[in-house]
Amino acid sequence: MSIESDMIHVEVVYALPHEQRVFNLVVNNHATVEEIIRQSGVLELYPEIDLAKNKVGVFSRNVKLDATVRDKDRIEIYRPLLADPKEIRRKRAEQAKAAGNADPVTGGKPNALRK
C-alpha cells in the first residue's frame, strides 16, 4: 500500500452564533474522531470546547470520540444547548393561555366551535 492511500481528507467544523470555523485536514485513515479534532487545532483556538462535555458528530449524526471516519467526512463539534426546548415550549404555551391566545383546557389554538 502506498502512503497516499492511507490518508483521507476530512473537515472539522465548529460553529458559533456569528462565526463558523472549518478546518480541512489530511489524516491517517485509521485516526479516531478525537485524534482528528486534536490535530485540527480547534481546541487551542477555542478553549471552551471540552470533549468530555461537548458532543460530536459526523454529518449531523452523533458519534463517539473513538469512532473512525471515512474520506470526505465532516466532523462537527456541537455547543451545549442554552435552554431546554421542552421548558421553552411549556413557557410559551403558558404565556399564550394567559394572553387568551390559547384554549384554556388544551393549551392549543382556540376552537371557535367550542363554547
Curated annotation (Swiss-Prot):
InterPro entries: Mopterin_synth/thiamin_S_b (IPR016155), RnfH (IPR005346), RnfH_sf (IPR037021). It comes from the Bacteria. Residues 92-115 are annotated as: Disordered. Pfam families: Ub-RnfH. Coiled coil: none annotated. SUPFAM superfamilies: MoaD/ThiS. Belongs to the UPF0125 (RnfH) family. PANTHER family: UPF0125 PROTEIN RATB (PTHR37483:SF1). This is UPF0125 protein VP0646.
